[in-house]
């Protein structure tokens, strides 16, 4: 049976994949993540997830390689990682009372057979109306500077929301496990008996 590789160095994706109790290794993909001119969010995450998985095929020639990529969209614009507290406050003020959509691209590449499975999972975050003081307090407490959308749903960020809508809550953290389990079963790797 091919071994499993996660084409990511994200500690959040690693922690999610560990839930499936299948042995795996992590490896850093070498992919230019620059969007193509006019590329829609769904196409971008799909292309990058596929590129990440396939970029490791030469290093791991008999493996199942998982690639994943995620972007955050607010008012039709891709929202990146804020990197500064001021930008985090601006992003959260813009998200206040709005719906932020996350698109997570997922690819599973069998490097032995060349078989590729892909999917894009959307996930909507409905923000409640936030006061300036709440935004300041949140940024000070959680420091979400390296999180798209300026929040951590697995932490205190949950206090910012009115509701969440999506097929799989893991999608919001960066790895849609329900879709991944379906893909793995198609490759004869069932997490329940692996």
UniProtKB/Swiss-Prot annotation:
Gene Ontology molecular functions: nucleoside triphosphate diphosphatase activity
Catalytic site: 69 (proton acceptor)
Enzymatic reactions: N(7)-methyl-GTP + H2O = N(7)-methyl-GMP + diphosphate + H(+)
E.C. number: 3.6.1.-
GO process annotations (BP): nucleotide metabolic process
Pfam families: Maf
CC per GO annotation: cytoplasm
Protein name, per record: 7-methyl-GTP pyrophosphatase
Species whose genome carries this gene: Salmonella typhi
Name of the coding gene: yceF
